[in-house]
Amino acid sequence: MSAQAKPRSEMTAEELAAKEDEEFNVGPLSILTNSVKNNHQVLINCRNNKKLLGRVKAFDRHCNMVLENVKEMWTEVPKTGKGKKKAKSVAKDRFISKMFLRGDSVILVVKNPLAQAE
């Protein structure tokens, strides 16, 4: 039976460490690992329809994250009066110096699309 097919409960400490290292450096979590190591920005789409652009300082396998220098962006549609005119949505943002983001609110994490390619 290979290490991949074994349940975690049956793995040795070395096998667990190797599997975790592979998950964080090769799999989808590698984007977060690279962001922490190289201090790159990432863009995070959240379930509340807001976007976060910031630097990841720490994270875990559940995508809980500690972020710094975060720009939170969202759009709001202002309430209109009695007129039948449709209101235009307004882009809003705010700066957050440090924050903890719970992983269950994360939909998507991508490298900063506006950063120059390296």
From Swiss-Prot:
One of its GO terms (cellular component) is U2 snRNP. GO terms for molecular function: RNA binding. Its main location: nucleus. GO terms for biological process: spliceosomal snRNP assembly. It is found in: Nucleus; Cytoplasm, Cytosol. The keyword Nucleus applies. Coiled coil: none annotated. It comes from the Eukaryota. Residues 29-115 form the Sm domain. InterPro entries: LSM_dom_sf (IPR010920), Sm (IPR047575), Sm_D2 (IPR027248), Sm_dom_euk/arc (IPR001163). Plays a role in pre-mRNA splicing as a core component of the spliceosomal U1, U2, U4 and U5 small nuclear ribonucleoproteins (snRNPs), the building blocks of the spliceosome. Belongs to the snRNP core protein family. This is Probable small nuclear ribonucleoprotein Sm D2.
